[in-house]
Design a protein with these regions (language model features):
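Charged, amphipathic alpha-helical regulatory modules used
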Residues: 1-97
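Generic structural signal for hydrophobic core residues of well-folded globular domains
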Residues: 37, 57-61, 219-222, 346, ...
Length: 564
């Protein structure tokens, strides 16, 4: 098909008409060249060899002007390929402020030095990547048949894509960040700060997004440490022997000041808290209530700290790290208050002008028996989440049962949208989600296949299989490249718990193999592809052409079959 389009362009450039006779000539010439390729080459032919065969065929047919034009076309393409793989050319584009390079990512402010450094490194990495990739993959990427994502990072480095870092193992068991060994935090505030520090380092060690999975449930233990501290303080504030009425007035005063401390504004104050234990004396009950009020404020401040630190961080790639926080399933008091604080902080906004926070992306989970129906214990928090979404765009809402049905187990998406499949650790026999990752993405340009098929479905399926094989090679290369990382390349990931706790000389593949890690195959243009065969109106208001729908589904099914 590329041969046909190139020769067709050459004919048009020498002012020859493009009628049925010319179409037949082009088709015959392409078939002749394809036949020679099959005879001469056991595997894929090099681009230069194909171009030579086309030139010779044109000359043999006495199409000298067309041959000359095709030669010029070939030279232009050769120059484009050479430039794409030339590091010096990449640097020159950066120096000359090529807008396609400078403005390629709207999330990055290209006026900032850190971003400029990353853009330069990315340009060099892309040029180097095209020399590192298998030739068939590099050629397909440059032609647009497939897209090898994130070439400004991989394969020049052995970095992986998105992940669910195991923040919770790191907080519980300690870790080292830079030159500082970190002990397990003793408060929700320190836990929140440590998480944002980990996030910053993870973002500098991979190129995809990251998610704090089930954050409310995991952070609850650190909020409980605050409660225990505040309970001890309350025992000093409300000592034994104090009149109960006097103690109650202290608690009521603290509760009265709570809405202002939590920036409630016109929001209805929370009802008076109840003690955890009703089988203790009245003074101890008042102490527990006072400790709860103070703990709620500590949780609110910690979640505010996390929100501000994530949005003020700028990592090695010149942008704010892409962070997602998944929450919504915790039902104990501490997890509920963490959920509330996350949502209240997002509703309030950042700074004196109350700007909507960009990060973290919030993902709230709805589950039957937890927060779905009015009688569920967390229904009030679901209502707050929906209020937050109407005012601040986030949180996104996911449904627990659907994710389990589709993926095999529950987890939040990694960064923006990719979900891990369910995976049971063969050593423990338990589901494992945290500490897992994706190694990269390759997408197939499906509309191009449809256009190149010229309405011939048999040819479409043949070309789809061929492009899928190229995508498969590209994904295998991604896996191979990630395996070349060593634990010392990314200590936070490989040595201190985000992905695992390996020795300095261990093989990182033990964290990838047996389906612990994933790779992703993407596609674009399913609707447009179907329109090539069934017309642009195959999708109509409130419906679609049944045959068109079945064809679109058959494409995805075929891709799924090949992946399996």
């Amino acid at each position: 098909t590329t041969i046909k389009s190139a020769v067709k362009s050459a004919i048009a450039d020498v002012d020859k008409k493009d009628g049925p006779q010319e179409e037949k000539l082009i088709r015959d010439l392409a078939n002749q060249v394809e036949g020679e390729i099959k005879e001469r080459y056991a595997g894929p032919a090099k681009i230069e060899d194909i171009q030579n065969l086309v030139e010779h065929a044109l000359i043999e047919d006495h199409l000298y002007d067309v041959a000359r034009t095709y030669t010029n076309y070939r030279l232009d393409k050769d120059i484009q390929r050479a430039k794409a793989t030339d590091v010096n050319e990449a640097v020159a584009r950066f120096i000359n402020n090529d807008p396609t390079l400078i403005h390629e990512n709207a999330n990055k402010d290209s006026n900032v030095y850190a971003t400029q450094r990353d853009l330069l490194a990315g340009a060099v990495s892309k040029a180097a990547a095209l020399n590192m990739l298998p030739q068939v993959v590099a050629n397909a990427h440059m032609k647009g048949d497939i897209h090898f994502h994130d070439a400004d990072y991989s394969p020049f480095t052995a970095q992986s894509n998105c992940s669910l870092p195991n923040f919770w193992d790191m907080l519980a068991n300690g870790f080292t960040l830079g030159n500082a060994p970190m002990a397990s935090p003793k408060s929700i505030a320190i836990a929140a700060t440590q998480i944002t520090q980990i996030m910053k380092d993870v973002a500098s060690s991979q190129y995809g997004g990251q998610t704090a999975n089930r954050a409310d449930e995991h952070l609850a233990r650190y909020a409980k440490k605050d409660y225990e501290k505040f309970l001890e303080e309350a025992r000093e504030t409300i000592p034994d022997g104090m009149p109960v009425e006097f103690a109650r007035r202290q608690v009521e005063s603290a509760k009265k000041n709570e809405p202002a401390k939590l920036h409630f504004g016109s929001r209805e104050p929370l009802p008076m808290d109840t003690p955890f234990h009703t089988d203790v004396d009245e003074l101890e009950q008042e102490r527990e209530i006072l400790a709860k009020i103070r703990t709620r404020k500590a949780i609110y401040d910690a979640m505010q700290t996390m929100e501000y630190q994530i949005n003020s961080n700028r990592v090695s790639n010149g942008q704010t790290p892409f962070v997602t926080v998944g929450f919504g399933l915790g039902t104990d008091w501490f997890a509920r208050e963490i959920q509330r604080a996350i949502l209240l902080n997002r509703i309030r906004g950042l700074g004196k002008d109350h700007h909507t926070a960009i990060f973290p992306k919030l993902v709230f989970t709805i589950k039957h028996g937890v927060n779905c129906e009015p009688e569920d214990p967390n229904y009030d928090l679901k209502q707050l989440a929906l209020e937050c979404a109407t005012k601040r765009m986030y949180p996104d809402v996911v449904f627990y049962e659907n994710i389990v049905k589709i993926t095999g187990s529950f987890k939040a998406p990694m960064g923006c949208r990719s979900f891990l499949q369910g995976w049971v650790n063969p050593e423990t026999g338990k589901d494992e989600e945290d500490g897992r990752m994706n190694l990269g993405v390759v997408s197939v340009n499906v509309p191009r296949i449809a256009l190149e098929s010229h309405g011939d479905k048999d040819r479409f399926w043949k070309l789809l299989n061929e492009r899928m094989e190229v995508a498969h090679q590209a994904l295998q290369f991604r896996i191979m490249r990630c395996k070349e990382a060593t634990p010392v390349n990314a200590p936070t990931l490989f040595r201190f718990g985000a992905f695992g706790r390996l020795g300095a000389n261990d093989n990182v593949d033990q964290l990838f193999k047996n389906e612990r890690a994933t790779v992703s195959l993407g596609y674009i243009g399913l609707a447009e592809t179907t329109a090539v065969f069934y017309g642009k109106n195959w999708i109509r208001d409130h419906g679609w052409d049944p045959e068109g729908k079945e064809f679109a589904l058959s494409i995805v099914k075929r891709m799924n079959e090949l992946c399996k």
